[in-house]
């Protein structure tokens, strides 16, 4: 389980019992690394995973929170460095750096995705009392080897909620990495990403 520490300068606040009871619990963590500007030597991958029959198994805020927290947890455990992510109602994308080269890097990727799918499906089927229900259809990955392709795919994933018409500004969608890159990347880096056109990118995204 990933824990997010408070700043040492944060002040502890006390809440009345009434306010504490009314507070809605949401996932508020974020990725613990800053954005990288270069391709990773071991391997850079873009991954897309889709729900079975494109059903909206992640439509609730809570399930998107759970899925994103699990992605962060697995990436940290397997030493992957996430560079972009977007979790939507029936699919997800992420771009990440593998810690391993060649076939070992691909195997590490398969481990992350299989655990994402296995653990989330088991939990949601238990919650819904639907043992054995198929949640995930498949996943698609691409090994990115060119810098321009890397930047274009980062832009695509950062802004994916806009592509699907969920928000006008992806920074307002908490289950994607747009606000993270704006807060942690340099203004020059963000400007460079925004200059890329993504309409010709070949990505499985018909969800």
Task: Indicate where each model-derived feature is located.
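Short catalytic/metal-binding and nucleic-acid-binding patches
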Residues: 1-207
